[in-house]
Amino acid sequence: VLRQNGIKTRYYGLDKNQNLTHSNAELAKEAVCGLFENRQIPNDLTLLACGTSTPDQLLPSHASMVHGELANYPMEIFSSAGVCLTSLQALKICYSNILAGLHQKAVCVASELTSPALVSKFYDPEYEATHDNPDKDPYMAFEKDFMRFMLFVYIWIN
């Protein structure tokens, strides 16, 4: 399965004890800072558009939290939320605002932090039930492990 899904590297927001190492906002901040020399955000950047389907909390918005993590100058912020296309929504906001002449410089970032839902304690009961009872169908335990390791583990940052 690993060979066929094409995933070569996995990144987790967890340490070896399954404690969070970063918030989603911190992951986005790291991605934005990585764009600039010396990791310094230019003060003429006037728009920050952030996309995620896994914000750290509902309020304030993900873009507000990322802006706070950046400890940057005042700027317009925009959050998009959803599933697959949040990064494109954020990119379109930057593109449209620059095209309309409302902003000269903008940054778009998309981040996901699914690691908190992937800690083993959420999957152990199913595994233990099938491991301790050889007559029980192990299909559900396999499905959960498959979803955990094959589909949800890749955390991407644009």
Residue ranges and their predicted role:
Residues 16-28, 54, 58, 82, ...:
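Generic, well-ordered alpha-helical segments
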Residues 1-46:
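Conserved active-site "lid/cap" helical segment
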Residues 15, 53, 74-77:
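A general structural-boundary detector
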Residues 46-54:
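Short glycine-rich or small-residue beta-strand-to-loop segments that form or flank ligand, phosphate
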Residues 33-38, 42-43, 58-60, 64-158:
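Acyl-thioester C-C bond-transforming condensing/cleaving domain
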